[in-house]
Amino acid sequence: MEEVINGILIREVETKNIMTKSSLPVGGYSVNPYVGCTHACKYCYASFMKRFTGHKEEWGTFLDVKHWPEIKNPKKYAGQRVVIGSVTDGYNPQEEQFGNTRKLLEQLIGSDADILICTKSDLVVRDIDLLKKLGRVTVSWSINTLGENFKNDMDSASSIERRISAMKQVYEAGIRTVCFVSPVFPGITDFEAIFERVKDQCDLFWLENLNLRGGFKKTIMDYIAGKYPDLVPLYDEIYNKHNRSYFEALEVKAEKMAKKYDCAFVDNEMPYGRVPQGHPVIVDYFYHEEIRGTENTGKRNR
């Protein structure tokens, strides 16, 4: 099936196996119920997928709905990290129609896998009933601003307020939550203000710097020049001259914030667990691809 719905090219495709061994630092499996993502984030690293999928359409304007053989032995994934949404958002608006992510969660019940769901949507609230049955599950929302105007410039996903509301509902349902402050835009993202909003409803507060590579570097640099011209020298220093002092200063700032609020300050995710309300673990993930190892220890590898 192929059709255009609300300006999005929708295809239904067959796949032999929905579970893919992951190359992510956390290991385990990467699971993407869709190909493509209709949030159309301007800074999305996943847009590189077009090189492998053969899509000619602009990123954010297409979505392949996967069909896969039922997972009949979920126990096979016991103890494994399963990341849902590494190069898509399983809770994109089309999930409401096709239900692929809910079907996947139903098939993983009883797996005893360590499941991480990455999203920018509040639709995940629909599946709280399943999340409770899965046990070791974490839901992470990307929130890098409290300003809806900047958010709207960057993506077409759920509003910031809806994401924060969803995080609260999931947290209060007893499910581990993450506020993923990513990407941190220099001079724009105020992570302390975000922390104040979410500290009582998340277990992890994760910081990651904006990486500019590939085709979207020009997109972002042009956006900054047009909307934030006073920040052009800073972005030139960071992304053309590769000066790291700005993010090094943010690391110091984040560590001071951790001490102020009596929060653990680590360089990678700690093993699965909950923390006292109001004291989320603060994860310093700046430049992680260069200085972090593959072990999920919570310690920096130098």
Task: Enumerate the language-model features and the residues they cover.
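Surface-exposed amphipathic alpha-helices with a cationic face
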Residues: 109, 132, 165-174, 255-259
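Conserved Radical SAM active-site core
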Residues: 1-138, 146-150, 160-161, 172
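Auxiliary Fe-S-binding modules of radical SAM enzymes
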Residues: 2-14, 192-302
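Hydrophobic faces of well-ordered beta-strands that scaffold small-molecule active sites
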Residues: 29, 82, 115, 139-141, ...
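Active-site beta-loop-alpha junctions enriched in small/polar residues
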Residues: 87-89, 120-122, 142-146, 182-184, ...
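Conserved strand-turn element in the central/C-terminal portion of the radical SAM core barrel
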Residues: 156, 168-189, 240-244
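Generic structural signal for well-ordered alpha-helices
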Residues: 102-105, 128, 163-167, 191-195, ...
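Glycine-enriched alpha-helix->loop->beta-strand junction motifs that scaffold or abut catalytic
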Residues: 133-139, 199-204
